[in-house]
């Protein structure tokens, strides 16, 4: 594996373990040349899935788009990269289990919101505001009220 810092091909694996959902192997590596450490993920190659955009266009599914959206929503929040990676794995697993060759962006967005709601409520509201295209303060208030109602319902 090439070191992302110095480009050397001389690296060693320090630790290997499956991700929580078993869909990938997480490897902690160290570069022999520069001594820096980095993480890699090994996944099996999936059958191509097409995403149906709002305007009807189709494009190849890209798990990195989901991950980047979640990272942005979780910015400056107490959510680790590994937690985000596991959430993305769960989303991809759900999509695979459905066996679809095409999926609408709406379905992906709802799965992302479901995972963010479990991870961090502020990140959930941030993502929802962009995903649902909030234009008024009342829309923020409504989603916060919804979260409070759900939380109160759990406490009973």
Swiss-Prot record:
Family recorded in the similarity comment: Belongs to the NrdR family.
KW DNA-binding (keyword) present: yes
Keywords associated with the record: ATP-binding, DNA-binding, Metal-binding, Nucleotide-binding, Repressor, Transcription, Transcription regulation, Zinc, Zinc-finger
Function according to Swiss-Prot or TrEMBL: Negatively regulates transcription of bacterial ribonucleotide reductase nrd genes and operons by binding to NrdR-boxes.
MF terms (GO), sorted A to Z: ATP binding; DNA binding; zinc ion binding
Organism: Thermotoga neapolitana (strain ATCC 49049 / DSM 4359 / NBRC 107923 / NS-E)
Name of the protein: Transcriptional repressor NrdR
Entries under InterPro entries matching the protein: ATP-cone_dom, NrdR-like_N, RNR_NrdR-like
One GO term (biological process): negative regulation of DNA-templated transcription
Record domain ATP-cone: where: 49-139
Cofactor binding mode and count: Binds 1 zinc ion.
Highest rank taxon of the organism: Bacteria
Renumbered zinc finger spans (unnamed): 3-34
Required cofactor(s): Zn(2+)
Gene: nrdR
Claim: Nucleotide-binding is one of the keywords in the record: yes
Signal peptide: none
